[in-house]
């Protein structure tokens, strides 16, 4: 339902020759089920939702004469405190980064959608903003957290040059035929298939390679094991002295797929390595290694409404906890955002309708406290 909704907003999902939405394999998936836009699905969803906001503002402009009468976007803004009144959230206090000017929002309901905490690790795929600030604000206000000990390290982040260490190398590379090799040129993942996965994953290169063209009659290549298994295997190879020059391993797709295939299926990865590392992935392997990627923990929420234990406070996306267990499957973060973001929004509206639209007033002394 949410994928269809995103298409009505303008998202351009890849299609099969039969006209159906294309679905690809990611690590840990038993079946290909990830709807995608090349290798840049997340960027396409951001573009689509930004475009939808602009469209709604244009509609408001026609209806009221004010494009910001319904939706107002505050860019480059940092929240530093949630405002509370009688045990219920009543807004937020923050500042504009460009000017340093302080200001406050009052609201009958607040949704925390501030993402994760990956930037607390030295090597991470996350942006500089992912420092867990939203979680800290909610915890100070009295919200409870869950599963904070579970942080996923994606197995493939860039290793060189130092300025881009940790930048994500999408799992799509392995889903489309890329394999992991150590410094000896060996596909080492066959040595790291846990007993629990033996019946599902190939034990020879020949069978693993056949899976790409005949998945119904062959076992999956071990490069597509769940992310924690692949990250541990890479770390073991590096510790055993079989790593790449900069402390990772090699991800090779150039020797296995044509240049046309790679540039068509993985355009973002091709340009990312060409521009940031001067590596042509159609001709040479990529250096990759584990990178801090996703926090499974977050605010404890009701699974149907995304409500926290604080009246009027809701949470969605990576800032919420409990949905992904201890190890999220690849692709499920975007599914999480689309499904539970909608639930959080609907529940916040229902809360306000039930408890009233009136927002509390805060004095200057309260804001400065």
Residue ranges of model-derived segments:
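Conserved redox-cofactor binding core of oxidoreductases
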Residues: 2-101, 113, 157-161, 166, ...
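Active-site and channel-lining beta-strand-loop segments
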Residues: 12, 177-190, 291, 297-307
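A glycine-rich dinucleotide-binding beta-alpha-beta segment and adjacent secondary-structure elements
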Residues: 70-75, 80-90, 95, 264-320
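Glycine-/small-residue-rich beta->alpha transition segments that form the dinucleotide
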Residues: 98, 107-109, 113-118, 277, ...
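Core beta-strand elements of the Rossmann-like FAD/NAD(P) dinucleotide-binding domain
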Residues: 98-109, 308-312
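Glycine-rich loop(s) and the adjacent beta-strand/alpha-helix scaffold that form part
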Residues: 109-167, 199, 327-347
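An anion/pyrophosphate-binding glycine-rich loop and adjacent beta-alpha core
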Residues: 144-275, 347-353
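Long, amphipathic alpha-helical stalk/connector segments used for oligomerization, subunit docking
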Residues: 351-369
């Amino acid at each position: 339902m949410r994928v269809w909704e995103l298409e009505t907003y303008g998202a351009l999902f890849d299609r099969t020759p039969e006209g159906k939405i294309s679905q690809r394999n990611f690590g840990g998936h038993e079946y290909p089920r990830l709807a995608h836009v090349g290798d840049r699905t997340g960027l396409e969803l951001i573009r689509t939702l930004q475009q939808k906001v602009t469209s709604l503002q244009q509609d408001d402009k026609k209806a009221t004469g004010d494009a910001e009468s319904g939706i107002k976007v505050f860019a480059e803004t940092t929240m530093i405190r949630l405002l509370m009144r009688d045990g219920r959230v009543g807004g937020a206090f923050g500042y504009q980064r460009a000017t340093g000017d302080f200001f406050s929002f009052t609201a009958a309901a607040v949704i925390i959608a501030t993402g994760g905490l990956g930037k607390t690790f030295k090597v991470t795929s996350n942006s500089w903003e992912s420092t867990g600030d939203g979680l800290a604000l909610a915890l100070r206000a009295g919200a409870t957290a869950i599963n904070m000990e579970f942080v996923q390290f994606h197995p493939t982040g860039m290793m060189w040059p130092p300025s881009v260490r940790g930048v994500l190398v999408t799992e799509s590379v392995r889903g489309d035929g890329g394999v992991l090799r150590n410094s000896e040129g060996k596909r080492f993942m066959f040595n790291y298939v846990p007993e629990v996965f033996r019946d599902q994953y190939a034990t020879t290169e020949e069978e693993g390679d056949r899976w790409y063209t005949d998945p119904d009659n062959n076992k999956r290549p071990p490069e597509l094991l769940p992310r924690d298994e692949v990250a541990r295997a890479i770390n073991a190879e590096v510790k055993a002295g079989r790593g790449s020059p900069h402390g990772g391993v090699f991800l090779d797709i150039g020797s296995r797929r044509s240049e046309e295939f790679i540039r068509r299926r993985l355009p973002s990865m091709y340009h990312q390595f060409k521009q940031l590392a001067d590596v042509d992935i159609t001709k040479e392997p990529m250096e990759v290694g584990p990178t801090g990627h996703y926090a499974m923990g977050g605010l404890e929420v009701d699974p149907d409404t995304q409500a926290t234990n604080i009246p009027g406070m809701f949470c969605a996306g990576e800032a919420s906890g409990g949905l992904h267990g201890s190890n999220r499957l690849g692709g499920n973060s975007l599914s999480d955002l689309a499904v539970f973001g909608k639930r959080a929004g609907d529940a916040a509206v229902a809360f306000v309708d039930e408890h009233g639209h009136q927002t509390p007033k805060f004095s200057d002394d309260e804001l400065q406290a």
